[in-house]
Amino acid sequence: GRGGYVIGVDMTSDMVSKARANALKGQYENVEFRLGEIEHLPIADSAADVVISNCVINLSPDKPQVFREAFRVLRAGGRLAISDVVATSQPPEDMRNDAVLIAGCMGNASLITDLEAMMRAAGFEQIRIQPKDESKAFIEDWAPGRNVTDFVVSATIEAVKPVACRSSGDG
C-alpha cells in the first residue's frame, strides 16, 4: 500500500534496470531496486517485514545461506513467503544434473523435508510447505516425456521469524 515500502533485489543489472523503468512508468515512489544476490542480500539486518521469493531459491547453490539471509533481514515477527518447485521424492541423478532442468527450476529442487530442516536451522518457525498438485499439469509441459512430475511439484512455502528473536537491528 501507500504506507509501505518495497525493496526488490535481482542479481542482473538488466532486470534491476527494467524494474526501475517500470516503477517510474507506474509512478511508484515507494519502491527501490538493488543489485545483489539472494545469498548476500544488500539489505540491513531486521529491515524487512516480509521477504517474498518466486522461483529463485532453486537456482541457488547454497540454499541454507538463502534462508539465513532471509532470517537476517526480517524483523522479529517477519514473514517469509515463497513460491518454488520442491521435490516430493529424490529425482534420479540424471535429472538432478541436467542443465535444462536446473534452469527450469526442476533439477535442483530440494526435498520438502530438507527445506524444512534448512529453514528450521536458520531459525524460522511456523514453517508450512504446501505442495500444489494442480501444478503438475504445467510442470509436465516444461519437460515433456521426462516424467518430472513423479519427483517435483510447485509449492507455497511460508515461515515466521520468531517474535522473541532479537538480532542486531531489532530494538
Predicted regions and their residues:
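Short, glycine-/aromatic-enriched active-site segment of Class I SAM-dependent methyltransferases
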Residues: 86-106
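A short glycine-rich, Lys/Arg-flanked "PGG" loop and its adjoining helix->strand segment in the class I
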Residues: 64-79
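A short acidic, Gly/Pro-enriched loop at the edge of an enzyme's catalytic core
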Residues: 39-50
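Helix-to-beta-strand junctions that scaffold the AdoMet/dcAdoMet cofactor pocket
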Residues: 1, 59-61, 74-76
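C-terminal lobe and adjacent flexible extensions of AdoMet/dcAdoMet transferase-like proteins
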Residues: 118-171
